[in-house]
Amino acid sequence: SNVNTPNWKEVTVKSRIPAELEKLSEISRNIWWAWNFEATELFRDLDPELWKECGQNPVLLLERMSYEKLEALAKDKVILRRMNDVYTKFRDYLDVKPDENRPSVAYFSMEYGLSSVLKIYSGGLGVLAGDYLKEASDSNVDLCAVGFLYRYGYFTQTLSMDGQQIANYEAQNFGQLPIDRVMDANGQPLVVDVPYLDYYVHANVWRVNVGRISLYLLDTDNEMNSEFDRPITHQLYGGDWENRLKQEILLGIGGILTLKALGIKKDVYHCNEGHAALINVQRICDYVATGLTFDQAIELVRASSLYTVHTPVPAGHDYFDEGLFGKYMGGYPARMGISWDDLMDLGRNNPGDKGERFCMSVFACNTAQEVNGVSWLHGKVSQEMFSTIWKGYFPEEMHVGYVTNGVHFPTWSATEWKELYFKYFNENFWFDQSNPKIWEAIYNVPDEEIWKTRMTMKNKLVDYIRKSFRDTWLKNQGDPSRIVSLMDKINPNALLIGFGRRFATYKRAHLLFTDLERLSKIVNNPDYPVQFLFTGKAHPHDGAGQGLIKRIIEISRRPEFLGKIIFLENYDMQLARRLVSGVDIWLNTPTRPLEASGTSGEKALMNGVVNFSVLDGWWLEGYREGAGWALTEKRTYQNQEHQDQLDAATIYSILETEILPLYYARNKKGYSEGWIKVVKNSIAQIAPHYTMKRQLDDYYNKFYNKLAKRFHMLSANDNAKAKEIAAWKEEVVAKWDSIEIVSCDKLEDLKAGDIESGKEYTITYVIDEKGLNDAIGLELVTTYTTADGKQHVYSVEPFSVIKKEGDLYTFQVKHSLSNAGSFKVSYRMFPKNPELPHRQDFCYVRWFI
């Protein structure tokens, strides 16, 4: 043949950045740019078209710029001046040292939403974790975080002609992301070897600079691993249960091994959702390796652990069959100094029940001193949900607390609103965002200025929709003339209502479409134009959620709804930012109490958007009359379908009789003064309470400070207190069953259960404590039963010790009930030690009458 086969050599051409622009490169490698809009705008202005093409990724932008373009920019005085201003701000920010008076924290989460450039998040949980890291950086606390670098991230969504969701997984090119490989002491890329039962999984470690703090990401997609283990970090929530377990071992055990390899030790370990619970397996192994027993080690681990639960339903927790769990975790009990059954029991509601699977959440509860839900109501729901773990106590007596989720103001507040706030608010605002006094200044802003800002944001959203969705709609909807008429129908002067969230069925996206005839009447009223914007993804395995999307798209194509109901595809952080700042009303209709917190409405709040929501999650606490609208928290029907119909009718009626008339009560200047009043009330009375600053401070004040204090108390002097408490617990366990009630003295009518209100009764018990010296507490528990058959605590009255003779302790209480009615009474004995953090820390209880 006259032509031989060509030999090709792969060549990577890296863009050579002129020395004058080096500072841009440095800024691009810290995700700080994502919430500092002078930086984002600077990158955008280098090449607006390319910036859009690169998905607003500054690393990719600088890589793709031609050498000529970069050379020209290096001589552009305006760009250089702006770059130097941003760089000075950036360096000043980084040079602040962390506050050493606050405990240091290691934070573990399966996902982080920092920017749509880094596809390592799927929804609210990830965005919350991302916001938390940004605020930790802004508040200058000593925190580091661990997660995964997913090869495919979470899917991007396209919709077929008939409205079927198509999930596309696109590989991320790690070389084009704002991340760096972590090097070991010898300057080699760090690899963490994580022991699974009889082999190791090898994880590369990457760092994301989130302002002042570091987020370490593990990645198994490398040639050191087999084809079975490379996919561990391919997809967020991807694969089967076996892959999920492998992910959770990597996050928990691999996460702690990563921090060890980097020489990082923190005061508090915060497990964000149960996925990271296995951090405590490795931490126990590490203590046992230093010569402590399991019982001593778990005292130290518990005292420095916080577990945050995000789901309100048992189905949301991960359960693993014993066989599968043993396949990968079988080697750990020996390192922890316990038996296999002991490890399994730490993850069971009913220790000893061989049929019960291992639950990560139960394991987290058993190995963390503190547990919290993510709103007041979710705290209550979690007390109920976990009450089976700590038998002997009622849900309302649980130590499970709550911190209501907030949002990172600099990320979610649009530049236009930030400018308005800075113009009118106190100059300390940035550092004191959760101070309600400062926000009251919104009342001094002229109504007209607020209306103008709102209209600017609406027009921006409408332009964005027209530009961004034209192409995808043309591809999917066939008839171009329909697209043009649809584009024309999007009206910035109409009341815009936004609904953006995961399409899980409990979020009830279908609610609005319960009565189509009534809905058609509302959206086609010429006096009160209104349009609905829907967006959201359904989990690839959630057929019902995908069905909902399909139904909404079908309805939106009917002639009477065309252009009035619009579905926007591929909901991500970029679209979310546009939507929560561009609509007038943010609609949220979950089935109560299934919305643990919900944060999109809080983001809307920061942008003068008014909430209209079911009283669930954060809105149950946030709602104020005259500052938004609410659907009652009461359930009228047990039957969900009937409840849905009632709630839908309520939504229609509030829209028709309150929201639309108020919005369109326009004055001569073209806006509604009544509407602006609601906007101002919402900003002044609600916004300061839902900043991420308030959330971070809550975590310190409610949990981190007391955990760190107790951990240092236990670990001082070679862990002396931890050893002492472990020995004391061991003694109580050994003697518990032999403790006996020697005598009991109470009036006959008390014994008969027939007592008078207001009358005082004296009750005396003599108990043989079997040498446990003051380690026994006794209390009288009175309960009442509600209509649903549930028993609740009415009162708990502690007995006093009035006499000691050797091991015989005489306990006495004076008891009276002021309210007449039907009650239940019992006596509860428990081990008592002032150095325990709460009762559920050592859950031994004996009831008697």
Residue spans for each PLM region:
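Catalytic cores of carbohydrate-active enzymes across secretory and cytosolic contexts
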Residues: 1-849
